[in-house]
Curated annotation (Swiss-Prot):
Name this polypeptide is given: Neuraminidase
Residues the record lists as binding Ca(2+): 295, 299, 326, 348
Domain notes: Intact N-terminus is essential for virion morphogenesis. Possesses two apical sorting signals, one in the ectodomain, which is likely to be a glycan, and the other in the transmembrane domain. The transmembrane domain also plays a role in lipid raft association.
Other noteworthy facts: The influenza A genome consist of 8 RNA segments. Genetic variation of hemagglutinin and/or neuraminidase genes results in the emergence of new influenza strains. The mechanism of variation can be the result of point mutations or the result of genetic reassortment between segments of two different strains.
Membrane topology: Single-pass type II membrane protein
Virion surface topological intervals: 36-470
Cofactor note: Binds 1 Ca(2+) ion per subunit.
Post-translational modifications: N-glycosylated.
Function: Catalyzes the removal of terminal sialic acid residues from viral and cellular glycoconjugates. Cleaves off the terminal sialic acids on the glycosylated HA during virus budding to facilitate virus release. Additionally helps virus spread through the circulation by further removing sialic acids from the cell surface. These cleavages prevent self-aggregation and ensure the efficient spread of the progeny virus from cell to cell. Otherwise, infection would be limited to one round of replication.
Gene: NA
Oligomeric and partner information: Homotetramer.
Gene Ontology cellular-component terms listed: host cell plasma membrane; membrane; virion membrane
Keywords in alphabetical order: Calcium, Disulfide bond, Glycoprotein, Glycosidase, Host cell membrane, Host membrane, Hydrolase, Membrane, Metal-binding, Signal-anchor, Transmembrane, Transmembrane helix, Virion
Length: 470
């Protein structure tokens, strides 16, 4: 074969191969078009929302993922999951002991990292996850602006949330709303957060729903409008929230607001025999919401508000048991008071909680009767109704040689199971006023959940050494 014949043969072969490749490409394109236009598709769907794979993994807000491959390019089409309002249909699980749930070691880590100064922490869950919440002071522990963070109210505070058991940092915290008093809860569809800000005599609350401001409430007594400092609870979209405006050492005006999708359905003044209400810790079960609160005026026993979210009504009383759970407090008496404050708190108090479930009742309190140190859980059957009830079992959470602080209840209402697992957190305050060699006041968090087993015990201190900050 001469050179010219070789060239012609090679060219013809290349032309045939090229033609075959073009035909394969046209066939592939036709098949893909046919698949996308096949009659069995559901063409009535609304316009889908496209996201990348990393959003699907992190947020977990979507389902029904369809992936079609065209020429090595992934096109991901997703639909937003439809969620319903959560209903409080279950009762509490039997509580025999408490296991560790979360601990952020924020002050220890903050000795050498950009950890935010916080206080008034809590835990709240949604259908996808549980997160830590707290009121930030707008500075880090090591920052110079941490000087003076012992003060509760300023223009620099904000409700933030961050992943469970991580410390709150500039990088992992999400701002929910701006203010120095807060509550937040998920109704099954989305989250409602409430923040209060402003001067003492003219504060106001902004109610956020689905990350947008929906409603505002102005002060009614012009004396530090304030709310729960832990999560609220929702039933069938109705989310009651307890507010107080007025004196911390005398009569005040408490209201229970009923919200749905961030809008006010109704509000009512405090009813029942409780004389003073602050900083309620709430939980829900069997279509009822129970809130254990703080009587800062007179009571060393804790007031309780029981709310019917269906009828949107409530009543109040005190925990009858002589096992007193506020701080400061006197030694436990022989007989408690159901409808009156038990004296001895010297116009002071601390946020606390309880699970009031007949023989399955547990009360939380500081171990010290004079200062915010130590923490223990006590099983006190029928504490709500029996004025002579006594502890039958206990578990130490924080030793009396270690600092504690506020405490409150929370539950994961979306966890699997036939009952709700009771959970709580304890604020571990460090810095001023007790440790005045440093200029700041902050905290870490430890949280526990109930077990039906009789588990071994351990204590859970904050663990930071103040001398490392000097």
């Amino acid at each position: 074969m001469n050179p010219n014949q070789k060239i012609l043969c090679t060219s013809a072969t290349a032309l045939v191969i090229g033609t075959i490749a073009v035909l394969i490409g046209i066939t592939n394109l036709g098949l893909n078009i046919g698949l996308h236009l096949k009659p069995s598709c559901n063409c009535s769907h609304s316009q889908p929302e496209a996201t990348n794979a990393s959003q699907t993994i992190i947020n977990n807000y979507y389902n029904d993922t369809n992936i079609t491959q065209i020429s090595n390019t992934n096109i991901q089409v997703e639909e937003r999951a439809i969620r319903d309002f959560n209903n409080l249909t279950k009762g509490l699980c039997t509580i025999n002991s408490w296991h560790i749930y979360g601990k952020d070691n924020a002050v220890r880590i903050g000795e050498d990292s950009d950890v935010l100064v916080t206080r008034e922490p809590y835990v709240s869950c949604d259908p996808d996850e549980c997160r830590f919440y707290a009121l930030s002071q707008g500075t880090t522990i090591r920052g110079k602006h941490s000087n003076g963070t012992i003060h509760d109210r300023s223009q620099y505070r904000a409700l933030i949330s961050w992943p469970l058991s991580s410390p709150p940092t500039v990088y992992n915290s999400r701002v929910e709303c701006i203010g120095w008093s807060s509550t937040s809860c998920h109704d099954g569809k989305t989250r409602m957060s409430i923040c209060i800000s402003g001067p003492n005599n003219n504060a106001s609350a902004v109610i956020w729903y689905n990350r947008r401001p929906v409603t505002e409430i102005n002060t009614w007594a012009r004396n530090i409008l304030r709310t729960q400092e832990s999560e609220c609870v929702c039933h069938n979209g109705v989310c009651p929230v307890v507010f107080t405006d007025g004196s911390a050492t005398g009569p005040a005006e408490t209201r229970i607001y009923y919200f749905k999708e961030g809008k006010i359905l109704k509000w009512e003044p405090l009813a029942g025999t409780a004389k003073h209400i602050e900083e309620c810790s709430c939980y829900g079960e069997r279509a009822e919401i129970t809130c254990t609160c703080r009587d800062n005026w007179q009571g060393s026993n804790r007031p309780v508000i029981r709310i019917d979210p269906v009828a949107m009504t409530h009543t109040s009383q005190y925990i009858c048991s002589p096992v007193l759970t506020d701080n400061p407090r006197p030694n436990d008496p022989t007989v408690g008071k159901c409808n009156d404050p038990y004296p001895g708190n010297n116009n002071n108090g601390v946020k606390g909680f309880s699970y009031l479930d007949g023989v399955n009742t547990w009360l939380g309190r500081t171990i010290s009767i004079a200062s915010r140190s130590g923490y223990e859980m006590l099983k006190v059957p029928n504490a709500l109704t029996d004025d002579k009830s006594k502890p039958t079992q206990g578990q130490t959470i924080v030793l009396n040689t270690d600092w504690s602080g506020y405490s409150g209840s929370f539950m994961d209402y979306w966890a699997e199971g036939e009952c709700y697992r009771a959970c709580f957190y304890v604020e571990l305050i460090r810095g001023r006023p007790k440790e005045d060699k440093v200029w700041w006041t902050s905290n870490s968090i430890v949280s526990m959940c109930s077990s039906t087993e009789f588990l071994g015990q351990w204590d859970w201190p904050d663990g930071a050494k103040i001398e490392y900050f000097l």
